[in-house]
């Protein structure tokens, strides 16, 4: 319902694979991290492992951030193939949309996806991988954020990071506006409850893609500068904000923004 990079009918897997190999070959050895995203990277099948092995050979000190829905790893043999690439310097970012399978499957528009993602998460843990669990904040997911936090603590306490992520308003999100759009200022109570509970339980929790001005002040310390440089921007009035240097800014690709955007003025006590 909210995919920011909707699928198209072109079969460009092989062309993009070759292009990516060339990009890796031209990357500086000092590159701190490299992201593998899509679409869905596991659609490459075993070529995904060839790509990862190529990165590890050419850029041995570079961290790999693999963004995937995790479903392919429900097959333990596929997870073990990734393990053969080595578990070091790989972080898998995997979304979970609800503690209820029906809500998760509705958002993905794929029946059974919740069960596959959960099994994939457990298989990746068995294989020794670090996982960043991602919860994209929309009208559906925000209804059960405290319950989601409890579910994560009880069922997925092994994840390395938990990231609550502001939604990029582009792609299918525009088409499904009435189903998924909610202004961030309208879910702050639920978000604060979920984040603070996970933090209290000792999980490493962050808030991505949300400006400080739309967050409750108690959440500022969890906010991360998370938006990629190529699609990051700030409004003109952000120059007046005392927290601009700490703030993630906005998606340049988003067609809609929160009505709560405003510069934050800090008054120092004399």
Model-derived regions, located:
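Short, histidine-centered active-site or binding-site loop motifs used for metal coordination
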Residues: 4-7, 98-100, 168
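Radical SAM/AdoMet-radical enzyme domain recognition
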Residues: 21-35, 45-165
């Amino acid at each position: 319902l909210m995919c920011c990079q909707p699928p198209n009918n072109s079969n460009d897997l092989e062309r993009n694979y070759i292009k990516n190999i060339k990009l890796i070959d031209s990357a500086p050895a000092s590159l701190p991290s490299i992201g593998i995203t899509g679409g869905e990277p596991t659609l490459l099948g075993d070529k995904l492992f060839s790509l990862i092995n190529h990165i590890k050979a050419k850029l041995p000190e570079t961290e790999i951030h693999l963004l995937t829905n995790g479903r392919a790893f429900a097959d333990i043999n596929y997870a073990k193939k990734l393990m053969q690439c080595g578990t070091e310097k790989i972080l898998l970012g995997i979304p979970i949309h609800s503690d209820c399978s029906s809500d998760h499957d509705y958002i993905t528009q794929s029946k059974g996806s919740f069960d596959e993602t959960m099994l994939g998460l457990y298989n990746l843990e068995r294989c020794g991988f670090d996982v960043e669990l991602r919860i994209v904040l929309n009208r559906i997911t925000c209804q059960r954020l405290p319950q989601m936090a409890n579910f994560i603590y009880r069922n997925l306490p092994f994840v390395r990071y938990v990231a609550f992520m502001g939604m990029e308003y582009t792609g299918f999100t525009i088409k499904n506006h009435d189903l998924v759009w909610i202004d961030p200022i309208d879910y702050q109570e639920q978000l604060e409850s979920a984040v603070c509970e996970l933090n209290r339980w000792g999980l490493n929790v962050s808030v991505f893609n949300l400006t400080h001005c739309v967050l409750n002040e108690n959440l500022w310390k969890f906010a991360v500068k998370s938006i990629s440089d190529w699609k990051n921007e700030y409004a003109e009035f952000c120059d007046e904000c005392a927290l601009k240097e700490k703030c993630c800014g906005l998606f340049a690709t988003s067609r809609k923004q929160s009505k709560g955007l405003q510069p934050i003025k800090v008054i120092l006590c004399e």
